[in-house]
Amino acid sequence: HFERFFTQTPEGVVPDIFNDELAVALIAENTYSVLSACSHRGITNILRTIGNCFPGYTFKLLAGGFHIHNAQDEKFSIIADYLKNNLPEQIGICHCTGIDKYALFRQTFGNRVFYNYTGNTFYL
């Protein structure tokens, strides 16, 4: 979904590929948790990269946006399929995922899914 985002370079205006996007992995007692922003590069790409760094660790928490609020349900299915095979204990979904997609995640993964928001506090 890079077609709507642009950045200024010395060569002119080009599509933004979000190569500067960040995610944070919190490591504690053989577990890892992932905090991300809107995941423009794809939450599954982020999770795969972090998961490969910590093989054998338990995936405790995913908190972030998946940026699929205007996407077809196919993108939801790709993410849901990945999560089914790499299931965290908790999934905190942020606004850019879209409330309709949040409902699908909640329906698919039940009580492990919560709606995350600015100022929310949760304990690992």
Regions from the language model: what does each represent?
Residues 1-11:
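Flexible, acidic/histidine-containing loops and adjacent segments that form or flank the divalent-metal
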Residues 12-34, 38-118:
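Cap/insert and terminal regions of metallo-dependent hydrolase folds
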Residues 119-124:
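A short acidic, often aromatic-flanked loop/helix-cap motif at beta-alpha or helix-coil junctions
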